[in-house]
Amino acid sequence: MLDFLKRFFGSSQERTLKKFQKLVDKVNLYDEMLAPLSDEELRNKTGELKKRYQEGESLDDMLPEAYAVVKNVCRRLTGTPVEVSGYHQNWDMVPYDVQVLGAIAMHKGFITEMQTGEGKTLTAVMPLYLNALTGKPVHLVTVNDYLAQRDCEWVGSILRWLGLTTGVLISGSPLEKRKEIYRCDVVYGTASEFGFDYLRDNSIATSVDEQVGRGFYFAIIDEVDSILIDEARTPLIISGPGEKHNPVYFELKDKVAELVQLQRELCNQLALEARRGLEHFLDMDILPKDKKVIEGISEFCRSLWLVSKGMPLNRVLRRVREHPDLRAMIDKWDTYYHAEQNKEESIEKLSQLYIIVDEHNNDFELTDRGMQQWVEKAGGSAEDFVMIDMGHEYALIDSDESLSPTDKINRKIAVSEEDTQRKARAHGLRQLLRAHLLMERDVDYIVRNDQIVIIDEHTGRPQPGRRFSEGLHQAIESKEHVTIRKESQTFATITLQNFFRLYEKLAGMTGTAITESKEFKEIYNLYVLQVPTFKTCLRIDHNDEFYMTEREKYHAIVNEIARIHKDGNPILIGTESVEVSEKLSRILKQNRIEHTVLNAKNHAQEAEIIAAAGKLGAVTVATNMAGRGTDIKLDEEAVVVGGLHVIGTSRHQSRRIDRQLRGRCARLGDPGAAKFFLSFEDRLMRLFASPKLNALIRHFRPPEGEAMSDPMFNKLIETAQKRVEARNYTIRKHTLEYDDVMNKQRQTIYAFRNEVLRSEDIFALAKESINHVALMIASLIMSREHPAGHSLPILEEWMNYSFPLQLNIEELRRLPSLDAIAEKVADELTGAFQNKFSSMVEEITAAAGNDVDANGICKDIIRSVMIMHIDEQWKIHLVDMDLLRSEVGLRTVGQKDPLLEFKHESFLLFESLIRDIRIAIVKHLFRLELTMTREQRPQNVIPVVATSFQNDENFGPMELTIISDSDDE
């Protein structure tokens, strides 16, 4: 029935395209009408359209004419020179109908999926122009500084011709320059630049003059799937150096390395023993049918199953798994030990290991033997694995009648400090083990200039300045014997998911979005529209070729490269990691095939390598760096011989990454072909392939070196990828649910901070805080289960300790209610502050004369104090929230929902934050002392309460570090 309705009415995509096509026809009609206008008359259209918008005409109504203006300008500029990145090139682009259609979709808030070479950059100019007519902030978000600069110079020339201003945010631009850029009609920049400016404005700026942004109206995100999905879990963090090094990493690194080495030796021994027993059978296509022989083989496979739980990448294990029958036996033991009735036997078997490694979930677990080894041989402590039950310990202290109240407080402080130390030690141990067991050099990171540089798993690009969180980066630094740097302290943070939700209107463009359409809809309320290509795609997509072993796969890849290379076709070989790219490079050198390598280690030569990749006979080995945002242009000879051939050495866990790699060839009607080579030892196959696929391997194993190739295998691979994508989507959604809690708190604090910065009557805000604190403290003390008279001395003692204020106890006793007492205390405190403020004004006037604005100076002092304590308490709150987030998962043991627990406890923490901010502000305001001489200039009395910031090459795009002037680094 649904299929019938779809055939009758068309799919939602078809209906949307049909509706937008009518608007395209209107644009073309206006384009013809604008042709007779002079250049000056066409330029004046911008002012005319702006005026019509201000008079109430909607952007939707003006769209056909505005888009026609842009199209007409593009046609008029054909052949004129444009300087892009220091090079002169002639303008040669006029939007096709499909580009106009994509531009309409973007204005309507769609994500447009346009194939490589279809002109996404030009398409974006039309909605940018239309929305800039409002005078509100319009941003084009790119994936790197180079593209932002290029697009601003290149297609931004159209906007400038029409009288609009354009600017580009480049990392490291000074404050005044950034303010000037944000005043432009259209601003180009990366997600991190826009995001960090938002965080700076709301957490670092100490005056309105230091804030650069002017709001969030409309944004178009280029490579939107990369930014909103691949980077979704990576928060933007402004941080500064911590107060001190965490000594745990220095103390434990050698001990952890020793424990991991013991595990490695144990697994190697088990694997070699199994290898000796199976040596005779490895070259047999079919195993013997003898029952006793099979039982013996099965026992050796049981040992290898144990090795797979301790060292999943053990070489002997991988060699044995090349045999389909032996692989099936190992998998059979895995199924056996996963059965509920065999759990005890599984635990007993796994207890032989020191550490159990769960490669599928990227996790690990110390066994009892591992813990015992840690305590006895590695010099660790049993207390590393036992956390203190704080509630129980506090209850014991409270019930100990031999302790005085002061002793009880001191004992609780000591217990709390011991708990903190144990948690820090246990956390450091866990991160060091993770660094050794799960993080691979040249896969997850590279070592460069005594630093650990993260490799982006989706793009293959190095990420200098970005650091793994929660101490993992320091653990890797200790593993690789590079300088262990200080832990950073977070000043401000936001995820890209919540940052882009700040915009009133959002749109995007990419070559691969349809596979993630569900996530775009549910998380961002964005629909995906696939825009037809201008020319038919001539790419030949071959079926994947499957090989039993990695060795056979690489042999086939080299043969394929040699065969294609003979004809002169340029070849792009995509690899999943730096390690694989270097391995393949060595194999090609052995076969005397000239080639170029592009990976995270030589990314500086990227532009040069990509420029040559489309030439006749070129062979380029690249990581995912070449899979997105690169436009490989063919020379004429390469087109004649059949265009670029893309070879994938494995399937990525995301279908989008594979589609991006395929999309490097056959752009804009050029010829090309793509083929992927896989082995059953690939990570995707090992961890996520279905049992059905393993059964097929056993029954249809071809002779060694021959490939299996069938659309059925492609379907099974796609199923595995969908399974991984679904899991990753769940993780991202889960992360967002937690971050949404933090986001509401962030918005509240930033709103309060901006109110303090912008308020013309800061004195009233200060008095409001004083009133809140007085009412809160008085009500808290007076609401105890004592007669009111008993609580009044405590209230008097607290007020005398915290503020220079003497209470009249007898007057308070005569008041009729607790509320009346609280209000009286608040009035007294507010009056005392009024007197202090007046005396400060008099002191400054006496010291500096009547020519200075003493009242304004005092207000600036109050503003600075309030901002300082908002920032300090917010930083502490961020640490508390991180700790809560890391611990709340354990609540599942008590049959509690961690998310609900997190929401509840984070609310309590936030209430505590608001209270602590107000108390800190009020105490500081009452303790302000002015020390001046008549020679001092009045502006010197304003305290400096914020650190300066730098953004240099040492601090990369995802974490911005704040360096105070006094820091010795």
Curated annotation (Swiss-Prot):
Its main location: membrane. GO terms for molecular function: ATP binding; protein-exporting ATPase activity. GO terms for cellular component: cell envelope Sec protein transport complex; cytosol; plasma membrane. CDD domains: DEXDc_SecA, SF2_C_secA. InterPro entries: Helicase_ATP-bd, Helicase_C-like, P-loop_NTPase, SecA, SecA_CS, SecA_DEAD, SecA_motor_DEAD, SecA_preprotein_X-link_dom. Its EC number is 7.4.2.8. Keywords: ATP-binding, Cell inner membrane, Cell membrane, Cytoplasm, Membrane, Nucleotide-binding, Protein transport, Translocase, Translocation, Transport. It comes from the Bacteria. It is a peripheral membrane protein. It is an enzyme of class 7 (translocase). GO terms for biological process: intracellular protein transmembrane transport; protein import; protein targeting; protein transport by the Sec complex. It catalyses: ATP + H2O + cellular proteinSide 1 = ADP + phosphate + cellular proteinSide 2. ATP binds at residues 99, 117-121, 631. It is found in: Cell inner membrane; Cytoplasm. Part of the Sec protein translocase complex. Interacts with the SecYEG preprotein conducting channel. Has a central role in coupling the hydrolysis of ATP to the transfer of proteins into and across the cell membrane, serving as an ATP-driven molecular motor driving the stepwise translocation of polypeptide chains across the membrane. Monomer and homodimer. Part of the essential Sec protein translocation apparatus which comprises SecA, SecYEG and auxiliary proteins SecDF. Other proteins may also be involved. Belongs to the SecA family. This is Protein translocase subunit SecA. The lineage of its organism: Bacteria, Pseudomonadati, Chlamydiota, Chlamydiia, Chlamydiales. The gene is secA.
